[in-house]
Amino acid sequence: MAREDHIEMEGVVVDTLPNTMFRVELENGHVVTAHISGKMRKNYIRILTGDKVKVELTPYDLSKGRIVYRAR
């Protein structure tokens, strides 16, 4: 369910930062800073270091993203 203008990639959470921000290493080796999407925050989905996540990136700034899914 990615938006048309967003790039969706998978990665692994490497580090937890303050204010529900995370450092995520993508499949291609790039490291981005990502925050939790509103629906995940609303449903109290916990994200820990080492979790596999799906990240939405915008073409305008590829260093920041939004975590939209956590794999089980």
UniProtKB/Swiss-Prot annotation:
Residues 1-72 form the S1-like domain. Its main location: cytoplasm. It holds the Pfam family eIF-1a. SMART domains: S1. CDD domains: S1_IF1. Component of the 30S ribosomal translation pre-initiation complex which assembles on the 30S ribosome in the order IF-2 and IF-3, IF-1 and N-formylmethionyl-tRNA(fMet); mRNA recruitment can occur at any time during PIC assembly. This is Translation initiation factor IF-1. It comes from Chromohalobacter salexigens (strain ATCC BAA-138 / DSM 3043 / CIP 106854 / NCIMB 13768 / 1H11). The gene is infA.
